[in-house]
Each structure stands twice: as structure tokens, then as C-alpha cells.
């Protein structure tokens, strides 16, 4: 039997995937516009910076020149982290919620490593008594 947290987790996962599908449709629908802007940016001849250019225009030009794989990584990591967090809310054990988020996962791994080192140091301090 699922509890309330698990039900809300599955509803969250469903809504998140639905919103993702809508966002992907929107992105690929405007992909043609992005390609046109990128081609215009490439076809322009290098010019001296004009005095009237604003910082927003120069920022837009620099961001458009970033490669596609970098944009993918920038958006994919937070997307997957949010999805994995929502998915972890569907687990039966409430103690495992959030373990798949990278900072929490690293903290748990480091804590386990420190605990293992402490335990092995305590074992090595024990002396065997030979009878």
C-alpha cells in the first residue's frame, strides 16, 4: 500500500514528465528560429564593436556562440537531478529520499568512507591476547 508521500511523488513525476514533453516540443518548434539566428551570427563579417551596443546584446551574441553540447549539459544536469529527486520520493523507505542528488550522494559516500576509516583504525588498535 502506498502512503501519501509516494502518491505525491508519482504525481510529481508524471507532471514533471508532462511539463518536460511540453518544453521539448516548444524547444524543437523554435529550433528553426534558433538555427536562423545562429546562421545570421556566423554569416556576419567581423566588425568593430559599435559604441551603441549594449551589454545584453553582447551577452546574447556570446551565448548563441556556445556549442550545442554545452547547452545540453547545462540543462540536462539540473533536469536529471530534479527527476531523480522526484523519483526517489516514490520509494517506500523515507530515509532514501534525496540520496540520488549529487551533493547529498557525495556527502553520504564521504561519510561512509570516514566511518570505515574510523572502524578500521579502531580494529587495528585492538591487541590480540594470546592465551
Curated annotation (Swiss-Prot):
Keywords: Golgi apparatus, Membrane, Transmembrane, Transmembrane helix. It holds the Pfam family TMEM251. The chain crosses the membrane at residues 8-28, 66-86. The keyword Protein transport does not apply. GO terms for cellular component: Golgi apparatus; Golgi membrane. It is found in: Golgi apparatus membrane. The keyword Transmembrane applies. InterPro entries: LYSET. It comes from the Eukaryota. Required for mannose-6-phosphate-dependent trafficking of lysosomal enzymes. LYSET bridges GlcNAc-1-phosphate transferase (GNPTAB), to the membrane-bound transcription factor site-1 protease (MBTPS1), thus allowing proteolytic activation of the GNPTAB. GNPTAB is involved in the regulation of M6P-dependent Golgi-to-lysosome trafficking of lysosomal enzymes. LYSET is thus an essential factor for maturation and delivery of lysosomal hydrolases. Belongs to the LYSET family. This is Lysosomal enzyme trafficking factor. It comes from Gallus gallus. The lineage of its organism: Eukaryota, Metazoa, Chordata, Craniata, Vertebrata. The gene is LYSET.
Amino acid at each position: 500500500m502506498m502512503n501519501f508521500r509516494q502518491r505525491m511523488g508519482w504525481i510529481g513525476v508524471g507532471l514533471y514528465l508532462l511539463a518536460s514533453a511540453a518544453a521539448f516540443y516548444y524547444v524543437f518548434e523554435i529550433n528553426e528560429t534558433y538555427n536562423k539566428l545562429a546562421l545570421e551570427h556566423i554569416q556576419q563579417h567581423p566588425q568593430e564593436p559599435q559604441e551603441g551596443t549594449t551589454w545584453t546584446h553582447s551577452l546574447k551574441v556570446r551565448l548563441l556562440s556556445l556549442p550545442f553540447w554545452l547547452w545540453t549539459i547545462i540543462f540536462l544536469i539540473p533536469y536529471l537531478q530534479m527527476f531523480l529527486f522526484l523519483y526517489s520520493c516514490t520509494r517506500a523507505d523515507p530515509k532514501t529520499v534525496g540520496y540520488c542528488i549529487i551533493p547529498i550522494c557525495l556527502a553520504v559516500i564521504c561519510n561512509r568512507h570516514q566511518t570505515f576509516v574510523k572502524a578500521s583504525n579502531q580494529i587495528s588498535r585492538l591487541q590480540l591476547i594470546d592465551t
